[in-house]
C-alpha cells in the first residue's frame, strides 16, 4: 500500500471526479488575509469545512446514545464562524464531495493550527467506493470557547492505494453514510 502524490490526486480529481470542487494548489490567503490553507498538497488534500454546523448543547438534559441519537441535543447554525463552547463538540461537513476508487482508502488528519489551539478533528476513514460530503467532528478540548472558520481548511486527507481492488467495498455492503449531503447525524 502506497501513499499517493499530488500528481495522482490531481489526475484522479480531474479525470474521475474524486474530489469536487477541486483546488489544484494550496490556498493560504484570501483578500490579502491569511487563512487556514486548503487545496492540493504534496501527498494529500486539505479540505474545507462548509458553513453548516451542528453544535452540542445541554439545554435539554439527555444522554448521548449512538443507537438512539436524539438530535434535540444539537443546535443547527449556518454561519461563516462556528463557536464551540468549552469542552464541547460540533459537527461540520466538507465543501468537497468525495468519490473514492475501489482500490483506495483515505485517512483524515487534523490541521496543526487547530490542534495547537486544542481543537481536535476526527473523521473515520473514507473507505473504497465511499461517496459524499464528509461529516467532520470538531472537539474543543479547552476550557474556553473555540472558533472554526467556514470556507477554510479544516483537515487533510491522505490517499493510500492498495495492491489490488478490495473484494467488498463500502458501496457493496451498503454503508450507512453513502452519498451523504451536508452534516449527517449518527445512525445504526
Swiss-Prot record:
Keywords linked to the UniProt accession: Hydrolase, Nucleotide metabolism, Nucleotide-binding
Residues annotated for dCTP binding in this entry: 111-116, 135-137, 156, 170, 179-180
Gene that this polypeptide is encoded by: dcd
Xref: Pfam families: DCD
Known role: Catalyzes the deamination of dCTP to dUTP.
Name of the molecule in the record: dCTP deaminase
Residues of the signal peptide: none
A GO molecular-function annotation: dCTP deaminase activity
EC number(s) reported in the record: 3.5.4.13
Broad EC category: hydrolase
Catalytic center residues: 137 (proton donor/acceptor)
Amino acid at each position: 500500500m502506497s501513499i499517493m502524490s499530488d500528481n495522482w490526486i490531481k489526475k484522479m480529481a480531474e479525470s474521475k471526479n474524486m474530489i469536487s470542487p477541486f483546488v489544484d494548489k494550496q490556498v493560504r490567503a484570501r483578500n490579502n488575509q491569511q487563512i487556514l490553507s486548503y487545496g492540493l498538497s504534496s501527498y494529500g488534500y486539505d479540505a474545507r469545512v462548509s458553513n453548516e454546523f451542528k453544535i452540542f448543547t445541554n439545554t435539554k438534559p439527555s444522554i448521548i446514545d449512538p443507537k438512539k441519537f436524539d438530535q434535540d441535543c444539537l443546535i443547527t447554525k449556518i454561519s461563516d464562524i462556528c463557536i464551540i463552547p468549552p469542552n464541547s463538540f460540533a459537527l461540520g461537513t466538507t465543501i468537497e464531495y468525495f468519490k473514492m476508487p475501489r482500490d483506495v482508502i483515505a485517512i483524515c488528519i487534523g490541521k496543526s493550527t487547530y490542534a495547537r489551539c486544542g481543537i481536535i478533528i476526527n473523521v473515520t476513514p473514507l473507505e473504497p467506493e465511499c461517496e459524499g460530503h464528509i461529516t467532520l467532528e470538531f472537539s474543543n478540548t479547552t476550557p474556553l470557547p473555540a472558533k472554526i472558520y467556514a470556507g477554510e481548511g479544516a483537515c487533510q486527507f491522505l490517499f493510500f492505494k492498495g495492491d489490488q481492488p478490495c473484494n467488498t467495498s463500502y458501496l457493496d455492503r451498503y454503508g450507512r453514510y453513502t452519498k451523504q449531503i451536508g452534516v449527517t447525524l449518527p445512525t445504526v
